[in-house]
Amino acid sequence: MITDVWKYRGKSTGELRSSVCYAIKTGVFDYAKQFPSSRNLEKFGEARQDLTIKELAEKFLALKETEVAKTSLNTYRAVIKNILSIIGEKNLASSINKEKLLEVRKELLTGYQIPKSNYIVTQPGRSAVTVNNYMTNLNAVFQFGVDNGYLADNPFKGISPLKESRTIPDPLSREEFIRLIDACRNQQAKNLWCVSVYTGVRPGELCALGWEDIDLKNGTMMIRRNLAKDRFTVPKTQAGTNRVIHLIKPAIDALRSQMTLTRLSKEHIIDVHFREYGRTEKQKCTFVFQPEVSARVKNYGDHFTVDSIRQMWDAAIKRAGLRHRKSYQSRHTYACWSLTAGANPAFIANQMGHADAQMVFQVYGKWMSENNNAQVALLNTQLSEFAPTMPHNEAMKN
């Protein structure tokens, strides 16, 4: 039986057979074009041209679910959702060409975006880094379509990434940090930002920090988990998982102060999700920082969220009269202050959860070179105490 026979009911079976045989003989036969509704298309690995970009993206995301962590999957979904709103989710994937992709990239780079709840958008568009990330995710969708026979070609061929300028850290100065702490409305907020700045932990790690992870007697703090969106996960990087942070005195003092507020509070049993799909572990956690201690309203949770910490930072920055920065600059402040104090970059990388010092050099390289005078002054102070001086007589002979 010939598939799609109704399409060809004006032709005899013999005529159809002759035209198909001739197309095969001359090398121009296209099974998918000749029989677009055939059940054999998938068997023969023929490209389907009828998937919308939304349908293709949904197939891609469905298979990604077991490959990546849920936080990464949510990022994929959010990015693709934003892109589809520009492309038009009902457009056929096969209709998207290079010109359309360049239009999408331009819109991402220069157009207005809808901000998340309580987020501050200071200017239209997105950074080149963000746009390149969006386009990389979209490229993965199209490549998935090619690899699995849904598309004949990837329209991303020949499109190069936008040139990126590396983000320069914008740490707080010591005077600004004092003003920030003074602007905090309660002791818990003061303690939280002291711990953040003097340890360099990520905001999500700060939210998930438990007293079970802290050993003030030995001056250490273990980072075992992270809060990502609505669930606990292991820290962002493998190197950052179960890392031991060696606490300096200001951090210890802040934790001792916080101990009086939350150390004897309720212990929770929480589910921590690992990188491996479907694997979780129950952990005991008495949260170090708790909204209940300083909440003005009753609809608080057992722990802070990354958004609530960011709002706390924004409010304190505004009250202190400081130039607006993102709360992640507290982490950069730790790194920059530590480098100025002469700490080994490898030690800083370990404290911050990086695999090696390469990330420290990449992120803070320019900042480090701008502080050469401070480094020379540091060396003069430290080395002058024990470095031998050249004898004057020997110097005269030479």
Curated annotation (Swiss-Prot):
Role: Integrase is necessary for integration of the phage into the host genome by site-specific recombination. In conjunction with excisionase, integrase is also necessary for excision of the prophage from the host genome.
UniProt name for this protein: Putative defective protein IntQ
GO biological process: chromosome segregation; DNA recombination; establishment of integrated proviral latency; symbiont entry into host cell; viral genome integration into host DNA
GO molecular function, one term: site-specific recombinase activity
Keyword Heme: no
Underlying gene: intQ
Record's keyword annotation contains DNA-binding: yes
Family (UniProt): Belongs to the 'phage' integrase family.
Active site annotation, chain numbering: 202, 236, 331, 354, 364 (o-(3'-phospho-dna)-tyrosine intermediate)
Domain Tyr recombinase intervals: 167-378
InterPro entries: CB, DNA_brk_join_enz, Integrase-like_cat_sf, Integrase_catalytic, Integrase_recombinase_N, Min27-like_integrase_DNA_bind, Tyrosine_recombinase_XerCD
Keywords, ordered alphabetically: DNA integration, DNA recombination, DNA-binding, Viral genome integration, Virus entry into host cell
Listed Pfam families: Arm-DNA-bind_2, Phage_integrase
Lineage: Bacteria, Pseudomonadati, Pseudomonadota, Gammaproteobacteria, Enterobacterales
PROSITE patterns: CB (PS51900), TYR_RECOMBINASE (PS51898)
Core-binding (CB) domain sequence ranges: 51-146
